[in-house]
Amino acid sequence: MSGAESFVPAPMYLTDAAAQRLGALVEEEGNPGLKLRVYVTGGGCSGFQYGFDFADTVGDEDTIIENGTASMVVDALSYQYLVGSTVDFEEGLAGARFIIKNPNATSTCGCGASFAV
């Protein structure tokens, strides 16, 4: 028996609030196959930034996270920065938006759209 331990990354989560809002947006679009694509790109004031888009296709390397009938998709490169994260939806004085609570981020910008690892 070897002393090596296997590593299983923590999954990502889509909160009920985010799933409800996503469901409403998909219904407005009239395409029940749409999913929320969450991705990470270089840039922003902290080094990386989050992005959101609709996707109606899923790549071979994509990970699908579901909550009820709502689904989000994350590409393999972005997933490594988002492991263990929670995607939520909030409404407040700053407006309504999807947000990411990322335990891997060592710092974030004031608006929460960019982060550093």
Swiss-Prot record:
Gene3D superfamilies in the cross-refs: HesB-like domain (2.60.300.12)
Pfam assignment, any one: Fe-S_biosyn
PROSITE patterns (alphabetical): HESB (PS01152)
Signal sequence, renumbered to the chain: none
Binding of iron-sulfur cluster, residues: C45, C109, C111
Cofactor note as given: Binds 1 iron-sulfur cluster per subunit.
Matches recorded under SUPFAM superfamilies: HesB-like domain
Function: Required for insertion of 4Fe-4S clusters for at least IspG.
Self-association state and partner proteins as the record states: Homodimer.
Protein name: Iron-sulfur cluster insertion protein ErpA
Natural source organism: Chromohalobacter salexigens (strain ATCC BAA-138 / DSM 3043 / CIP 106854 / NCIMB 13768 / 1H11)
Gene designation: erpA
